[in-house]
C-alpha cells in the first residue's frame, strides 16, 4: 500500500483553515500518512516536526539516520514556535493580509510586463 507524505514547510501558516497547511486546504489530512514541516519559515523559529501514526513515529525515532546525534529543541525555540502557532490560529486576518499582498505583487509584476506564469 503506498504511503502519502506531505512536506508542509511552505503551506503551514499560509493555506487552509487557520493556516493548517495544504492538506487541510484540500481536505485530505486524513488520507496522509506523514505530515512534516519546519519551524524556520512561518513559525520564525528553529527545528521541525513529523506527524503520523504513533507506530510510524516510534519507528522513525529508533531507525532514521537523521535522528543520530540529534538534539532536542531548546525551550525558547519551542516556545517561539508554539506562540507563532497561537498567533496564526487566533489572528486569521494575517493570512488574509498575506494573500492580499501576494495578489497585489502578482498583478504588479504582470502589469510591468513580467511573465510569471500561472501561480
Model-derived features with residue positions:
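Fold-independent oxyanion-binding glycine-rich loops
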Residues: 8-9, 26, 38-40, 52-54, ...
Amino acid at each position: 500500500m503506498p504511503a502519502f507524505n506531505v512536506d508542509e514547510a511552505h503551506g503551514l501558516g499560509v493555506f487552509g483553515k487557520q493556516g493548517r497547511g495544504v492538506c487541510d486546504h484540500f481536505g485530505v489530512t486524513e488520507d496522509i500518512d506523514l505530515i512534516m514541516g519546519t519551524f524556520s519559515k512561518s513559525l520564525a523559529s528553529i527545528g521541525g516536526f513529523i506527524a503520523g501514526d504513533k507506530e510510524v513515529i516510534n519507528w522513525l525515532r529508533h531507525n532514521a539516520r537523521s535522528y543520530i546525534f540529534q538534539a532536542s529543541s531548546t525551550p525558547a525555540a519551542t516556545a517561539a514556535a508554539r506562540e507563532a502557532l497561537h498567533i496564526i490560529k487566533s489572528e486569521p486576518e494575517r493570512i488574509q493580509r498575506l494573500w492580499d499582498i501576494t495578489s497585489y505583487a502578482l498583478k504588479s509584476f504582470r502589469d510591468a510586463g513580467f511573465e510569471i506564469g500561472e501561480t
